[in-house]
Structure formats: structure tokens, C-alpha cells
A protein has these predicted regions:
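Hydrophobic membrane-insertion alpha-helices, especially the h-region
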Residues: 10-24
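Extended assembly-interface/linker segments at domain junctions
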Residues: 112-117, 125
């Protein structure tokens, strides 16, 4: 009765391949006139939580169900998704050098939760997995503010690039910036330790600790640490 939280399932990173880039032909003319507005802020699109309850036959689990840990018969799968698009303006100094200023960032966030329980499972097991769901949703409550804070540190940032193909190098740089933003979001979100502590408090659902109390204690103790 353990939630599975390896990073490959806990946090899935999605970076939009087509980052927002203003027209290369316009960069040379407009960059000298345009400066990023001081009040420019990143755009955060936080999607509602997508939740599903799935029941399975232990003798024939569905192909899309993550493997159960040894000794466990149910699990809560939480996927925190993030993708970022980054746009900028370039000021070209010569044929192989330019300065790119980041002027636009949009981050889209999503949380998908699936609780997997076997047919005929007890209510106690279901309640334990619901506790894992509550922990994930607690972290997602402030995910928008976290993403905004991280993205804001990149707004207006100027990056020097050197290449024979400045357009391609600019695209590569903006894509890397998008990756950096989502990587930092994933690192700081980090609900894993709280999920592990919740399992420790409840002995993976084997004891009689009230789920609500266990969730609160796990969140509080991790926050103190």
C-alpha cells in the first residue's frame, strides 16, 4: 500500500519543442529600440488536478499500471507535469555574435493522480492511498507560485551567444532556458520526502493511524526540517 514515487513517475518533464522566438529578420531592426518592459512577468498556466480511480485484477494487471513494490497491493501514482516556452529578442553585434534578452516565459503545470487498488480491497487500503493523493495535492496548491518565482528570475536575462548560425544558436539557448526552468521547478517542488514520511508514520497503511493526522504530521515535520 505504498505510493510509487521514483522521479520518472513522480515528475515528468515536458519542454515545448517550439519555444517562442520572435522573427529573426526583425531582430536586428527592433532590438535596439525595444527593451523588455520592467513590469513584464512570466505567465503561469496551472491546470486543474486530473484524478482517476482504477481497479485492477491482481492476477492480470493492466499494461498501463506501474509495477507494485514488493509486498504491496495498491499504489497512488502522481505525475507532476511542467512545460515551459521561452521567447526573446536578439541584438546582433556582428555576423557571429549577438545578445539575446529573454522577454517572454510561459509555464504550464499539471498534476495527474491515479489510485490503483485491487478488486475487493478494504476501505482502509483505499483511505491510505487517498492520503498519498492529499500530500500530492497539497504540494500542487502552491506550485503556481513556485513556478512564477523561478521563471521571474529569468525574465530580462541577457545571454551572449557566439555562432555562425545565430538563429539556430538562439533557438538552442531558449530551449535550454526552458529546460532549466522546469528542472528547477521539479527540484524545488519535491514532494517525495513527505510521501516517504507519510508511509513511515502509517507503516504503509498497516497501522491504525488516522490518515488525516498522518498527512498533517508528515507535511508539518518536513516543513520544519
Amino acid at each position: 500500500m505504498e505510493a510509487l514515487f521514483p522521479l520518472r513517475r513522480l515528475i515528468l518533464l515536458c519542454v515545448l519543442p517550439g519555444v517562442l522566438i520572435f522573427g529573426w529578420l526583425k531582430w536586428r531592426d527592433l532590438s535596439a529600440q525595444r527593451q523588455p518592459r520592467e513590469d513584464s512577468v512570466p505567465t503561469i498556466n496551472k491546470q486543474p488536478v486530473a484524478f482517476a480511480n482504477r481497479t485492477f485484477d491482481p492476477a492480470a494487471p493492466p499494461a498501463d499500471m506501474p509495477p507494485l513494490a514488493s509486498g504491496e497491493n495498491a499504489e497512488c501514482e502522481s505525475n507532476f507535469l511542467s512545460n515551459a516556452s521561452v521567447g526573446g529578442e536578439s541584438r546582433q553585434s556582428d555576423a557571429t555574435h549577438a545578445t539575446v534578452t529573454i522577454t517572454h516565459i510561459k509555464v504550464t503545470l499539471q498534476l495527474n493522480i491515479t489510485i490503483w487498488v485491487p478488486t475487493g480491497v478494504t476501505q482502509h487500503v483505499i483511505e491510505h492511498e487517498e492520503g498519498h493523493r492529499q500530500v500530492s495535492e497539497f504540494y500542487y496548491q502552491t506550485a503556481g507560485k513556485l513556478a512564477e518565482r523561478i521563471a521571474a528570475t529569468y525574465m530580462g536575462k541577457q545571454i551572449e551567444i557566439t555562432a555562425t548560425d545565430l538563429g539556430a544558436e538562439s533557438t538552442k539557448m531558449l530551449q535550454q532556458t526552458a529546460t532549466d526552468i522546469t528542472d528547477e521547478y521539479n527540484k524545488e517542488l519535491n514532494p517525495g520526502p513527505t510521501q516517504l514520511l507519510y508511509d513511515a508514520i502509517t507503516d504503509h497503511g498497516r497501522n491504525e493511524v488516522v490518515v488525516r493526522d498522518a498527512v498533517a504530521a508528515a507535511i508539518e515535520n518536513i516543513a520544519i526540517e
